[in-house]
Amino acid sequence: MGGSTSKNSFKNTTNIISNSIFNQMQNCISMLDGKNYIGVFGDGNILNHVFQDLNLSLDTSCVQKHVNEENFITNLSNQITQNLKDQEVALTQWMDAGHHDQKTDIEENIKVNLTTTLIQNCVSSLSGMNVLVVKGNGNIVENATQKQSQQIISNCLQGSKQAIDTTTGITNTVNQYSHYTSKNFFDFIADAISAVFKNIMVAAVVIVLIIVGFIAVFYFLHSRHRHEEEEEAEPLISNKVLKNAAVS
């Protein structure tokens, strides 16, 4: 697989994992829509030292429970596998019996690397949105600080060794089971034709051997039948010779 395709697979896999975890997080966020909103309307308003900070409380044990469920791992593996299919990375799957093994390897990779520690580190703090709206004339807002501590999960995953091991392992799995496409599409076609041709040649050899076998059996039976006829004919000839001798 080329470097560009590997990078795309790595990036897409990371996005799928982060989106899947985020979907589980939404079920565990105690305040689904957290937002700080400050509106300044009218004229001549003066605001000093405005500070906004927002954190959504999140039960990490809830997220860990959902992430460790078998359904989550299976669904995540299905999403990754489908994504790889959409990229035509697994182009040879119609010829390759290893599709099931590939999917199993991906699932095992997720189980090993997506640990509760990684999940807890990436979802322990989640922030919403800070909004400051000023409308009107002559309004002054000084020393306004907006602290947004929203942790983008994909960034957390990309910086995590465990997540890197996950995506790297999946990429290696794809490389292993998609060795045809790692060379060249036309090489894949040539290999496919060669494989079919070899199967045809094997079938032809088998047919020839069967025909030769039939000929050998036929020749053996025919020779045996002819030998039996000759043995039956010998007494008749002897009797005829004796009769002729007696008449003489």
Swiss-Prot record:
Q: Tell me, in a sentence or two, what this protein's role is.
A: Essential for viral fusion with host endosomal membrane and core release.
Lipidated positions for N-myristoyl glycine? Answer: G2
Q: Which UniProt keywords apply?
A: Capsid inner membrane protein, Fusion of virus membrane with host cell membrane, Fusion of virus membrane with host membrane, Host membrane, Lipoprotein, Membrane, Myristate, Signal-anchor, Transmembrane, Transmembrane helix, Viral penetration into host cytoplasm, Virion, Virus entry into host cell
As for membrane topology, the entry says:
Single-pass type II membrane protein
Name its species: African swine fever virus (strain Badajoz 1971 Vero-adapted)
What's the protein here called? Inner membrane protein pE248R
Family membership noted in the UniProt record: Belongs to the asfivirus E248R family.
Chain ranges sitting on the Cytoplasmic side read 2-199
